[in-house]
Structure formats: C-alpha cells, structure tokens
Amino acid sequence: MTAAPATPDPLRTHDLVGIGIGPFNLSLAALAHGLPTPLTTAFYEQRPAFHWHPGLLIEGATLQVPFLADLVTLADPTSPWSFLNYQRTQDRLYPFYFAERFHIHRAEYDAYCRWVSTQLPGLHFGHQVDAIRWDPQNARFDVDHTQLDAHGEAESLGRTHTRHIALGVGTEPHIPEPLKPLTDTGNAPVIHSADYLHHRDRLLQARHITVIGSGQSGAEIFLDLLRARPTGNEGLHWLARTPAFAPMEYSKLGLEHFTPDYTRYFHALPETVRDTLVPQQWQLHKGIDHDTIAAIHDELYRRTLHGGWPDATLTPGVSVRTAGRVANTRVELHLEHTQQSTRTRLTTDAVVLATGYRERPLDTLLHHLAPHLRRDTAGRPRVDAHHRLDLGPAVTGHIYVQNAERHTHGVGAPDLGLAAWRSATILNDLTGTTPYPLPKRTAFTTFGLTQPAIPTQQPTLVPLAHP
C-alpha cells in the first residue's frame, strides 16, 4: 500500500525535519519509523519523486557495495524496510536467492529505494526548502518551504517547526574550471555523466566521442559506448588525469576504511592530517571495479579477432588545459601529458564529462544561522563525532549532516555501506537512548596506536644490554 502524503502541520513542533530525500535521509526516515518511542518527523524533497542517479542506470551496471548496504540492514536486520523484505514483497526472493548476486544492479537499488519512499509516511516530495532560522524564544528551528506543482512552479508557501534537522541535500555534478566553457549551448553535445542516459541516442550519432574522467562512471560510459559502436569505426577517446586507469581498492582489509572504526579514527585526527589523507585515498572510492576493467579489455580484444585494432584511444595522465567550441559544431581540447610535459590538441564531436560530484554548498540554506556556525581553518563547517554541525551554545537544537562531512569523517561519508550506521548514530544521539545498539568494533585493523593499559603494579625495568 502506498502511503498518502500528509499535509505538513504548520503549528506542530516536530522532533526532526529532514531536508533532502536521497538514500541517506531515506535511511534515516526508515530507521526513525521503527523507533519504539515514535518521533514526529517530516522530510522534504524538491524533486517530485525519488530517483537515484537516473542518468547512470546503465543496463547491467551494478552497485559497488553489497546488497547488505541497503537503507537499514547494518543497523537493524529485522526492519521491514530492508532490501530482502522488498524482494519478498515483490515475490522475487527465491529468484534472487538462486541468482547468487552479492552486488545488485543499480536499477534494482533505485527501484528498492522508490518502493520505500512510497511506503513511508512523512515524506513530502515537491517541496523546496528555502531557509532555516533559529527561534530562541521557542527553542526550535523554523523551516520555510515552497510547495511546487507538477511543472516545478511555486504553488504555496509553508513553515515547519522542529527541534532538530538532518541535512541530506546530496551532491551536484562537478565540472572543472577548464571545461566550463564547454557547457555553453552548441551543436556538439557536451554533457555531464549524470545526464548520460538522457542524451545517449544523440551522443551515438556523433562521429567521434571523448569521455573525460577515470572513475567508475567514466569506465561504464566508455564501455557502453564501445559496445554500441561498429567494429573498426568506434571513434572513441577516453582521457584520464590519473596516472592509470586504476582499479578500486577492494581488498578485504582495504574495505575496512569504510567502517565505523576508521570513521572514528579519521575524525580524531588533526585537520591538516585529514586534508592530506583524503586526496591520497582516491583509489578507495574513485577507482574502477575489476569487473568493469575486465569487460572493457575483453570488448577491445574481441574487436581485434579479425585483424586490426579498434579505433579507440585510452590515455591516462592527461589534463585538459583549456577547451572551446570550433565553429559551434565541434569541440577542441587542449591537452597536457603530466609525465611527458607534452601538449597537443584533440578535436571531437561530443564530450562526456565524467568528472565526478561535489558536496552541495550549505551556505545559502544556512544563511540565517551563519553567526552561530563554527568553521575550521579552511572555512568549512565543523562537524562533531555525532555528525552535528557545531552551532555554538546559543542554538540548543542540532543540525545533523549526511554526506557533507568528508573533510571531518573521511572517505566513508558518501559510502552507502555506512548509511544505516550513521542514521542509527544520529537517532541514538537525538533520542538520548540506544534504540539501535551499535557494534563497538567493526574492523580487524587497529587504526593508530592505542593508549596502553595502566598496569596495577609498576613493572621492574631491565636495563638494555650494550652491544
């Protein structure tokens, strides 16, 4: 049964208001729904319905985390909002069992999340949050929002009161500065990977296509284009700034960087050390999974079986210095090889920018709270171990952040595998209880040196022998 969206009550003071309904706030809403002592909650999302990266739901593309990294299981395996229960309700549990798939298709994960989003009460799609204010007299936040019609136009204004807020506004496509001139309208299509499927047919009409970016999205798009092009007339370039088309670190001990243990360790490090670590760990979250790399090589090799090499060029270690349009029908890229210190030009008919995402800035949304918001030396919001913004003593309510704290919590901040744990951490802190008991240890790796236990009796020191 689909839950009918309730009209927000303008007089009620909620316990929690969520802003943004992506996987992370959807996880929070699902676990909040299962609390033994119910919370009054409302979650707002500007989009008309839940959709998870619709432009990247490429046929056959899978998640890079196991299905256990759903919205709830790693905090509450008995929750009715688990992926396995979704499979049961769809009468697909036995087929899934026999499929023996630990990593599910992205389209299936999207369908699962949409199923949850249509069942949970208190989710308000088509609502744009405009401002957040602190009301000291009533010790609560005022959340101003606009209800949008089916065309995205303003329909009515509203205000919701709440004791606490969870920001889950997600990320937005990132386009590096040298590539921004390409985003102007022109006959040669230049699109971000986030919109790939929406423009795929138009891209395939181009004689030559260039994919820029060495991460998983770039690899999947290159593979999809390669499979769609005729042998010998592929007309593809794949450029990467990284020194290699490198695999993602997926060893079992390497994956322990995506545990609560490592998150706590990272948060306790000095700010300067954290800032040094994050870019060094790019292969933990920006590499390509082994299966995709193998599939690309297999497809390229298959195209050599009858002699000749495919018309596909894969070049790592390349940065785009400048870019522009040629006669409005083609694109010219000025390239530099970082190891050779050589430069060249590449003219192409279409470009896919698989250049990643950045956290959405919070400053506009938090404009009225700016005097209370404490920042680090780089001007970023400080976030404590419970994922709360440091707002100073004048604001007694909490604002929790989800996927806006990589600078304080490390590479696991955007990882789906930590979604349920972070949601449970937030709810335990918000309620002051432990409705979701969390494991004390989650990794075999001991990150850092632990403080030695103080012995009950001072040991006798034995002098070191001189050589």
Question: PLM features: what roles do these ranges have?
Answer:
Residues 1-48, 96-216, 220-467:
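Flavin (primarily FAD) cofactor-binding/catalytic cores of flavoenzymes
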Residues 62-82, 245-248:
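Short, solvent-exposed beta-strand-terminating loops
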Residues 52, 83-86, 115:
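Tryptophan-centered motif/residue detector
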Residues 74-106:
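A conserved beta-strand/loop capping segment in the N-terminal third of enzymes
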Residues 52-71, 257, 288, 292:
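Glycine-rich phosphate-binding loop and adjoining beta1-alpha1-beta2 segment
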